[in-house]
Regions:
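Terminal or standalone catalytic/regulatory effector modules within metabolic enzymes
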Residues: 1-162
């Protein structure tokens, strides 16, 4: 798998690695770097977990299309369905999760690319979110590009609450 991390994410992760090497006084192996990368950005926390989603497009009175999202998540051990609407699936997801958490969430940065090829190709989504003035990076990897984005958002949220 090849990750092409955005520059600000590289800077954020370099601080994690620097702290580890400063604490141990040793260089770390690539396996340990990958483990720390996953722990800090992909497999983050357990408070919120993506399960599935359903998106439909709707014409609103504003004569613009709007995405309506039904997002199924596990939140603190309970499976729930939350709903959001927005100008695209990511905005709809942010709106649904902001309502769930009673806190506005903003997207600060977003990148996505394929990490494999073929019919079953996977995508990596890198999303930096801002919650209450603090920023958090999350990464999602999924064969569904929308699900990868949702997973990245949720990883960032988990980093903020776990």
């Amino acid at each position: 798998m090849v990750c092409r991390c955005p520059r600000r994410l590289q800077i954020d992760f370099s601080k994690v690695i620097q702290e580890i090497t400063d604490d141990s006084g040793k260089e770390i192996e690539i396996e340990e770097i990958w483990k720390e990368f996953r722990k800090n950005y992909i497999d983050v926390g357990t408070s919120l977990k993506y399960l599935s989603h359903n998106i439909s497009s709707e014409n609103s009175s504003k004569k613009t299309n709007s995405d309506v999202l039904k997002l199924n998540v596990n939140f603190k051990g309970e499976e729930i369905e939350i709903n959001g609407e927005g100008n695209g699936p990511i905005e709809a997801c942010i709106n649904a999760l902001s309502e769930l958490l009673h806190s506005p969430i903003k997207i600060s940065d977003y990148h996505q690319h394929a990490i494999s090829s073929g019919a079953d190709a996977s995508a990596a989504a890198y999303i930096e979110i801002s919650i209450e003035g603090k920023t958090f990076w999350g990464i999602g990897i999924n064969s569904n590009t929308v699900a990868a984005s949702f997973e990245a958002i949720i990883s960032g949220i988990n980093k903020s609450i776990d």
